[in-house]
Amino acid sequence: MAAKKVVKQIKLQVEAGKANPAPPVGPALGQAGLNIMEFCKQFNERSKAQIGLKLPVVITVFSDRSFTFITKSPPAALLVKKAIGLETGSPTPHTHKVGKITRKQLEEIAKTKMEDLNANDIDAAVNIIAGTCRSMGVTVEA
């Protein structure tokens, strides 16, 4: 049997354990002709351990209207905000600092994000996360 033909890839950010047919999930999957409730059930089951976090998900749609999906780790900015208890980052990150983060906290976040980052080792991953912190107005402590 030949491999199924990929028709489309859909990228969404959905809150873990709370996928439902309402926007943004419903319209995006409906346009591709997918069974929305089937995706919601599978996604909620697979992501129930990470409730409360927004997870990026890449849905691959095939020509026979079947699908597969991959959940990725939460965005770095979301993990940084959660680690230091922020609501939002700074509107002017270079002049107005909104918090501080330690190297240990950066390493925890980097370990979580490691599989999705373009980094060879933990130090490179920490530097990537530190850059995200600086662009949010968070001071990185040595």
UniProtKB/Swiss-Prot annotation:
Superkingdom of this protein's organism: Bacteria
Pfam families: Ribosomal_L11, Ribosomal_L11_N
Keyword RNA-binding in annotation: yes
GO BP annotations, alphabetical order: translation
Residue spans crossing the bilayer: none
Xref: SUPFAM superfamilies: Ribosomal L11/L12e N-terminal domain (SSF54747), Ribosomal protein L11, C-terminal domain (SSF46906)
Listed GO MF terms: large ribosomal subunit rRNA binding; structural constituent of ribosome
Swiss-Prot/TrEMBL keywords: Methylation, Ribonucleoprotein, Ribosomal protein, RNA-binding, rRNA-binding
Gene Ontology cellular-component annotations: cytosolic large ribosomal subunit
PTM: One or more lysine residues are methylated.
Subunit structure as annotated in this protein's UniProt entry: Part of the ribosomal stalk of the 50S ribosomal subunit. Interacts with L10 and the large rRNA to form the base of the stalk. L10 forms an elongated spine to which L12 dimers bind in a sequential fashion forming a multimeric L10(L12)X complex.
Family annotation (NCBIfam families): L11_bact (TIGR01632)
Family membership noted in the UniProt record: Belongs to the universal ribosomal protein uL11 family.
PANTHER family: 60S RIBOSOMAL PROTEIN L12, LARGE RIBOSOMAL SUBUNIT PROTEIN UL11M
Described function: Forms part of the ribosomal stalk which helps the ribosome interact with GTP-bound translation factors.
Protein's UniProt name: Large ribosomal subunit protein uL11
Upper lineage: Bacteria, Pseudomonadati, Spirochaetota, Spirochaetia, Leptospirales
